[in-house]
Amino acid sequence: MFERINKIKKKIKEKLSYSILKDEKIDYYNLPCPEESASFLSKLTFSWTQRMLMTGYFRGPIQMSDICDLPDDVKVQKTNPILDDIDFGNSKWPLLKFIYTNFVTKNKKSIFIVILCAIFSILSPLCLKYFIKYIQLSKNEKTFLTGLGYCVLLFVGTFSYTLSQQFLYWFGMRTSLHVRGALSQRIYEKMLKLSSSGGKKYSSGSIMNLISTDIGLFADFFWIGHLEIIIFPIQITALLALLCWIVGWSGLVGFGVMIISLPINTFFGSKMSKNLMLSLGYSDTRCNLTSEFINGIRFLKLYAWEKLFLDRIEEQRRLQLKYLYRRVIFAIFEKMLSQTTNAVVLVSTFSVYSINNEIELSVAFTAITIFVNLRQPIMRLPEAIHNLLGLIPSAKRVESFLQLSEIQTQPFINFNNKSINDDILIDNGTFNWNQDNDDYITNNGDNNNNNNKNEIKKRLIEKSEEEYETTTTTTDDNNNNNYESYLLNNINFKAPAGKLTIICGVVGSGKTSLVSGLIGEIYKVSGRVNTPNKISFTTQQSFLLSTSLRENILFGNEMNLERYKKVIEACCLAPDLLQLAAKDLTEIGERGINLSGGQKQRISLARALYANSDCYILDEPLSAVDPEVATHLFNHCIQGMMNDKTRILVTHQLQFIPSADHIVVVDNGKLVQGTYSELKSKGIDFESIMKTKKLNIDNQQQQQQQQQHDENEIIDENPMKKSNSLIESNKLINIDEIISDKHDSNLIEKAKLLVKEDKSEGAIGLHVYREYFKHGSSTFFFIATCVVYFFSQAIFQMTDFWLSTWSQHKLQGKSDSFYIFYYIIFIGLFIVTLVIRYFMLAHVTFSASKNLHTSLLNSVGFASCQFFDTNPSGRILNRFSKDIAEIDLLLYDLFSDVLYCGSTVVFAICVMIYISPLISLPFLVLIIVYNIIKNIYAVSSRDLKRYESITRSPIFSLLQETFNGLVTIRSYQQQNRFISMMQDHININLRLFYYSFSIHRWIGVRLEFISALVVFLTAFFSLFNSNAGFSVLSVTTAIGMCTYLNWAVRQFVELEVKMNSVERIESYINTPKEGNRFTIDNEEEGEENMINLNEKWPSKGEIEFRDVEIRYRPTSEPSLKNLSFKINSNDHIGIVGRTGAGKSTVGISLFRMVECSKGSILIDGIDISKIGLHDLRSSLGIVPQDPFIFSGTIRLNIDPFNKYTDSEIWVALEKVKLKSTISSMPLKLETMIEEGGDGLSFGQKQLLCLSRTILKNSKVVLMDEATSGIDYVTGDLIKQTLLENFNDCTMLTIAHRLDTIIDSTKIAVVDKGELIEYDTPINLINTKNSKFSKLVKYQTDFHKENEKNF
């Protein structure tokens, strides 16, 4: 028989597979929602979901193409606009009130179902009362048809109540999705509008936490909690009225006990709410730190600071768990009180009733059934109330976020007609980063900035160290938080239309603040600003999306192939595209992790150029490229394709100043502006500035004669030496060969960087549960907890047996007090075991939650860089936010429900079979059917949950990227496009919720029908039982079992669904780690392999590369090939080459950020692959190209391990010209800095990173474009500081500015991953046709030409 069933199943599977998969190109987005076209019967039974369920069961795991569209009323586009009418005002809880008014009360169907459900709740006890009376009749008084009629009534009464509950859940679900979608989208849209001051109050991590945790609590509550608060009081009142009718005024005693328990329940609920609010606060901080940790993971690894950050996160986790544990304790007390109340109600009611009445079967068991029906509302009402109270903190957090200050929607007068002067203007403009402290700004009414010109002239010409210490703006003594805000007070600015305006000034002078004022990113307090409608803006730190290079350039604009090709050529990107596997369709990693700094800047510039805007505002777009490329970009982009547009260029590269039509010199928020000749006439001496950066090679050339070098010193035979420069390559490449409308899908797939998020298939494996219990304590301890649960429930079941005995007075000669006494004993034992079981389970789940997070954090924290390259930060943060939140807040209740309901069902079945053995056969059939239905449901339910988790990651990834690129997105007016993208992501995620809830109802209706059938069969077989007491006991047990069986099945499946979070975390816990953190002496490997690493290593600083080859991925082309050279102790090596040549890879290979695929690197004769990563990285020093500043004090950013004294820190700050800046801050070294160093300029961040390295005083130091964001004068002073402080160190300097490395001991020229030249600067200069000599000649000729222009 089973073989035949399998054959049928196979045929169905094949047929279904063909019918569903025959059109593989089907667009699942366009599949209509089957509910909307379903018949009344299909809607009543939720049969419209069966296509998807059967697909999953017969064909295998369901795919996204099997999931239909959402109903229109659930889509974000429909629900989000409803929130437009919310008025926060001065009312209490405005958000909750608004949701109740606009999402709950307007749903008339749900209110009708609430009333219907309350009415049906008393139907089953009434039917039972008359059935018991019938059972107690003598045989002569009974007829089969009458008995059958009562059985049918019991079936109808039971099923009607449970069916109405299903629709109660259904309408609640729709409200939940309305609220989830609307609030999630509203938070994202609010983030797009946040002002600079508003944005500082929230990080991307805390906003993610709002959506994952707080909005999750909203969705959970408005799924059913909001209706429970309405229906439970009605239900309790109706059932109590029925109880009083059955047992008289004795029922009021029980009611009185309930009333007394409510304030205590409310107290516990408020305590739970308070502790939840506190835990959410620490959860926010934890998520912020985790987000910061993931975003800065490369820098933390380079500094060997992972453990420091992990400890900071763990401390916040410890505080979060402290309050979560308190919440669990109060939850246990609340559960104990609820269950104890039920027992006390029974004891008190029957004790009082027995005084004047005899306990009869119809009275006792009808009362018990009423109490069974009362048990859920009595237990769940306090839970619903404290869930509402717990929602209040989340509501306040969401309200606070939604009320943050926004950017000014109309801060400017946009000109688009000839009547308005089309120059870009600021008239008497006063700007501030924080719009909440206008009093901080003083308006002196001085409209003439000429009074400042002498001071600026003095600062530009004089180059003393003291005068060029970096400064910030005036600080308000009354507000310690204003130090980071550059103040622009009463300024006048002009950028002539169709002309080039260059803005220059020292580090921290206010250049970025000025352009931020032009695009509306800082608050305009007063004045007038004229800007065009369409502006392209490039930030100093390039913003790139995790998508293809082409999409980053198009940035939402339509493809114009001819213009696109011109942009690629103008931005010198053709040679870079030629090296990429899928050309411009190659996927760029998050924040452009697989690109060099110069490539990122050129892509950002290409985006601005392609947009074809009225005005281009470019903030330091040339700092990360070599001088030749910078000149090309200036001539072909800024002065080429942009030539007829208004251009505002912020730059430190003053060689371009003579080409400017208008020049603005900024110093400390003050402006002097005019043409070049006008500024010269005012005394601004640009010639002296230019002379500070001229390459000083004349003396070196005079000291040595030109000579031909030995082949051993210079790699003349290297074919790469003969290759063209980037500019020449750009000219020679046929652009049509690399840019095309036709694409090779195989190449595109191969070039993908991000890996697809894994989705497990099938049931949650036992290994996931074992892993959970192992982290909780042990599997044995959990089994012991289960035993206590079953023992506790066995004692509770004895109370029903005892009541049955009491009602029939089977023990002759015993008074009611005897029965009451032992009834109380059973209740007391039950309460004791109740306490034990809850605390045992709390220990398991709480320990698991704590240890899983620790394991996850350590696994991710010490994972390889490739892991972060291929997994977007949003996906990783999803584990730390949503998945951890589900484990923290849900698994305890789910395990408790499953064990409680499961043990109740087991004992109920045992009782029914014991009383009526004949029921065993139909029970077996029903159990088989039950199991089939559960299996059909479980397959799709698991897959939907897994897809829900996966579709959540794009929401967080987009949110993270949007937060990082807010300025760029707003300047390009791309908000609507990103809003639309988020709407799509949220709708897809809601779709998984919708169909997951729908199949919940599908199984619910069927299980409730089978449960009602169980009641019918139990009642039917009891008709043939001569023992009335046992017959009634079996029927009441069956009625009680229905509720618990269905709840057990639902909660078990929900538990399995939520264990998906454990499964997802476990997959990350098993992430391969980088390698050993510490060096291990292993004598077993032999003396030749032993590492003897002392504390002073490296003491010499000798470095040797031996045939090094490095690949970022096993399948990718090598980034470094056959690299062999030696660096002597105390040598200063300059590493040059075009952008993307492999310079940074050479540097970071010393830190083993990428392991050598071939060859080895030795420092002081020791192969660094044998050195622990922490030992290696902590022994080296680095100043990275993109500075990393994390949230915390300035002291913590400079000296996180508290190793140095204040005086040592101040000396380091003085050496990098930051002492006066930091000392002007109110709290000095204890001043708090926001994530990413908001409030500090790019150059200041670089200098702060430099101070860390100076303080560390390592023997080997890597400088990776460490001064690219610093003006030349400050750069010269920093260069002198480096020579003084690192004179006895081995230093590798990666730079595009040749003046930075011209005094190096040797120069290494890298091109296409190979070392093509390596010698002293003078030898390379004197070598005919050397690449370095060409670079020097180019810059020298360029500077000479510029000096003529000056």
UniProtKB/Swiss-Prot annotation:
Domain (ABC transmembrane type-1) ranges: 107-390, 774-1061
Membrane topology per record: Multi-pass membrane protein
Domain ABC transporter as annotated: residue spans: 473-693, 1103-1337
SMART domains recorded: AAA
Database matches in Gene3D superfamilies: ABC transporter type 1, transmembrane domain, P-loop containing nucleotide triphosphate hydrolases
GO biological process annotation, one example: sorocarp morphogenesis
Domain of life (superkingdom): Eukaryota
Entry annotated with the keyword Nucleotide-binding: yes
GO MF annotation terms: ABC-type transporter activity; ATP binding; ATP hydrolysis activity; ATPase-coupled transmembrane transporter activity
Gene Ontology CC annotation, any one: membrane
Binding site residues for ATP: 505-512, 1137-1144
Location, primary (coarse class): membrane
Family according to the record: Belongs to the ABC transporter superfamily. ABCC family. Conjugate transporter (TC 3.A.1.208) subfamily.
Name of the featured protein: ABC transporter C family member 13
Organism of this sequence: Dictyostelium discoideum (Social amoeba)
